């Protein structure tokens, strides 16, 4: 492999993608963050959050997806198997390590200027993480910050995976978002 056309990450996976981007030697052409959790939370608070988040995700497995609507904005039957599998596979140690390495209360890592200009930080206007958008905009002033009007956390990729994939292909091919009816002007 000599290059990556796109690095895409969602939710808490944004931390992992950002770590990859700051360390990889491979050229990356475009980056798309969908509802990235760019919260900056102190270590003690993250430690307190760990058992609660662990139980919430495990409950998806124990309830066969019945708690999905309480945890996420939707309970679409098509996504339940993924969340059930995640709940089944999750260990407390993995959850603790993930939170130890994520959402840290420290400055955002810098990106090369050229890559920053080809990076999209998308947020749904209805998602809780929208509140982090302003701090991300300050850290990466040359990036694009599209808002999906009326959408919740990761709603487009969950409710229309094929449409989301077409949008990402468009980003790869043209370096911009296509016209989308819910894209805030």
Where are these regions (language model features)?
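Conserved acidic catalytic loop of the alpha/beta-hydrolase fold
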Residues: 1-5
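Gly/Ala-rich beta-loop-alpha elbow adjacent to hydrolase catalytic centers
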Residues: 8-13, 17
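Flexible "cap/lid" loop of the alpha/beta hydrolase fold
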Residues: 22-58
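Conserved alpha/beta-hydrolase catalytic His-Asp/Glu region
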Residues: 60-113
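Conserved serine/cysteine hydrolase catalytic core
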Residues: 100-138, 156-157
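Catalytic histidine neighborhood in serine/cysteine hydrolases
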Residues: 140-154
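Catalytic histidine-centered segment of alpha/beta-hydrolase-like enzymes
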Residues: 151-165
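Alpha/beta-hydrolase-fold serine-hydrolase catalytic core, especially in secreted/extracellular enzymes
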Residues: 176-185
């Amino acid at each position: 492999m000599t290059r990556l056309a796109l690095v895409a990450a969602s939710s808490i996976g944004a931390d992992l993608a950002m770590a990859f981007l700051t360390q990889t030697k491979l050229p990356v052409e475009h980056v798309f963050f969908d509802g990235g959790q760019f919260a900056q939370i102190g270590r003690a608070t993250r430690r307190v959050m760990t058992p609660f988040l662990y139980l919430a995700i495990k409950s998806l497995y124990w309830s066969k997806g019945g708690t999905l609507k309480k945890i996420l904005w939707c309970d679409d039957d098509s996504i339940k198997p993924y969340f059930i599998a995640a709940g089944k596979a999750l260990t407390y140690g993995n959850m603790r390590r993930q939170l130890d390495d994520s959402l840290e209360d420290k400055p955002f890592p810098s990106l090369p200027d050229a890559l920053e200009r080809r990076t999209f930080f998308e947020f749904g206007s209805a998602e809780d993480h929208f509140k982090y958008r302003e701090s991300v905009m300050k850290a990466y002033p040359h990036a694009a910050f599209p808002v999906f009007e009326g959408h919740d956390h990761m709603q487009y990729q969950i409710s229309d995976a094929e449409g989301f994939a077409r949008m990402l292909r468009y980003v790869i091919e043209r370096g911009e978002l296509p016209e989308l009816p819910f894209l805030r002007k």
